[in-house]
Amino acid sequence: MSEQADATPAFRQLSIWPLRTERLMLRPAELSDGEVLWRHRSLPEVGMWLGWHPVDREDWNETYTAKYADYLVVELDGEIIGDLMLRTSDGWGQREVKDQTIAVQAELGWTFAPEAGGKGYATEAVEALISVCVEQLGMRRIEAGAFAENEPSWRLMERVGMRRESYSVKESLHRDLGWVDGVLYAILADEWRERLAHHQKD
């Protein structure tokens, strides 16, 4: 984790929660959300592309308790349909300007219940989270990565305006597929603002 274990992630300290979009509501995840999130994260078709897939309820409870502070939940009509990850990190800089690189970029991730697919919910939620990163947290760069074979995930990155910055051959060891390719996408804060301005003109 990019932040110290005993530190509260900056996004949790914002006063904007719960954040409402056209159809959804986003809010920081709580320990009590673990039961609902288990239902879709434990599915084989979902766990296929996750960095960790709980082997049983005990494993899930232990890991979720350790990680939930970095997550938000996405609700539709009061029901949780997915979760988002938001982690901030430092950029790289030469020693003389290193102080200007602290906590200036964010890494995003997401998981949605299969029945929520194909309705634009993920796009709506991720766009809202990018706006939070840029306008509320002052991030200058937002990144997201995926297994190259997880096309729905990187297609989502493209829909929200991220550009593919790298394609790495056999860089990651998948539990079932062996060594597989990976992709990295990113968008800068200025690019995000330009995208919003362009859409507002349409």
Locate each region found by the language model:
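Active-site rim helix/loop that mediates acceptor-substrate recognition in acyltransferases
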Residues: H53-E75
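Acyl-donor (CoA/ACP) binding surface of acyl/acetyltransferases
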Residues: M1-M48, Y71-D202
